[in-house]
Regions:
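Well-ordered beta-sheet/strand-loop patches within structured domains
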Residues: 1-132
Length: 132
């Protein structure tokens, strides 16, 4: 799929080492962030403010690079190729930890419950069944 505003992955992708072909990315469906149930991805993680996230990741805060990234994210397919950034290596690397909870403890002994969009609860329950 070609880059551009119609691309399902949006205008920018943040790749990181993992064994699951998962990455963080922009989206062309911004309305999903206003929904209560946002588990609409196919495994990757959509970012609501990808440009702000890119700026956060830049250790040196190089203004020219930020301008090029912004241009790359907003330009159409006829863009000035000299101003488009294709890859930026984040240095130093930023650790990324992804957790998946369907139940989460809240203050006061309450529990927040979330949809099990990946179906992991049944797998875990089957593994723990003999101990219950």
């Amino acid at each position: 799929q070609r880059g551009g505003k119609g691309n399902a992955l949006g205008r920018i992708i943040f790749r990181f080492d993992n064994n699951f072909s998962v990455f963080l990315h922009d989206t062309n469906s911004k309305g999903v962030f206003g929904q209560e149930d946002r588990g609409v991805s196919h495994g990757c993680i959509r970012i609501e403010k990808p440009y702000d996230f890119a700026v956060f990741l830049l250790a040196d805060k190089n203004e020219k690079l930020k301008e090029k990234i912004y241009y790359s994210m907003t330009a159409d397919s006829l863009a000035n190729k000299k101003l488009v950034v294709n890859n930026v290596k984040v240095n130093p690397q930023v650790p990324l930890f992804i957790t998946y909870y369907t139940l989460y403890p809240l203050a006061g002994g309450r529990i927040a419950e979330y949809s099990d969009v990946y179906g992991f609860d049944a797998v875990i329950f089957d593994m723990l069944r003999k101990y219950l």
